[in-house]
């Protein structure tokens, strides 16, 4: 059973990246929530993963780990930094533009956007680590 699940890890990672991308676009363009600078950096890491993981899942190509894992880990680090900006009093970032990077916007009423982003990048990274070829 575990072997079967591990063979679908690339598909699950692709699904997580698709959901993250759709949520990002939904909040930006349909709800008109302006993203901060760190959100743009996280998008730079997330958006290519949709294409990269989609193609690699279709081709069952595990060499994608070389390209996708660094993107997921960099995105995770940026998201965790933004969570720290929001949660630790006194932390500031000078490059924030009109929208402050420490502004809290809750998804579904209980989780902040950067925390959801960090969880998504963490899930993608772990799914890539545990992925095996389909049989």
UniProtKB/Swiss-Prot annotation:
Family affiliation: Belongs to the DsbB family. BdbC subfamily.
Main location as per UniProt: membrane
Disulfide bond sites: 36-39, 96-101
InterPro entries, per the entry: DiS_bond_form_DsbB/BdbC (IPR003752), Disulphide_bond_form_BdbC (IPR012187), DsbB-like_sf (IPR023380)
Taxonomy, superkingdom: Bacteria
Keywords carried by this UniProt record: Cell inner membrane, Cell membrane, Chaperone, Disulfide bond, Electron transport, Membrane, Oxidoreductase, Redox-active center, Transmembrane, Transmembrane helix, Transport
Regions crossing the membrane: 7-26, 41-60, 67-84, 109-131
GO biological process: protein folding
Compartments reported by the entry: Cell inner membrane
Alphabetical list of Pfam families matching this protein: DsbB
GO CC terms of this entry: plasma membrane
Gene Ontology MF term list: protein-disulfide reductase activity
Protein's recorded name: Probable disulfide formation protein
Record membrane topology: Multi-pass membrane protein
Known function: Required for disulfide bond formation in some proteins.
């Amino acid at each position: 059973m575990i072997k079967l699940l591990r063979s679908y890890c690339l598909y699950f990672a692709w699904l997580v990246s698709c959901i993250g991308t759709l949520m990002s676009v939904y909040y930006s363009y349909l709800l008109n929530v302006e993203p901060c600078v760190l959100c743009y950096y996280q998008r730079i890491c997330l958006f290519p993963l949709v294409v990269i993981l989609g193609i690699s899942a279709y081709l069952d190509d595990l060499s994608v780990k070389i390209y996708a894992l660094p993107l997921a880990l960099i995105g995770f680090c940026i998201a965790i930094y933004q969570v720290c900006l929001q949660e630790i009093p006194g932390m500031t970032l000078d490059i924030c533009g009109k929208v402050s990077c420490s502004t809290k916007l809750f998804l579904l009423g209980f989780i902040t956007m950067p925390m959801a982003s960090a969880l998504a990048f963490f899930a993608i990274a772990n799914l890539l680590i545990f992925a095996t070829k389909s049989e």
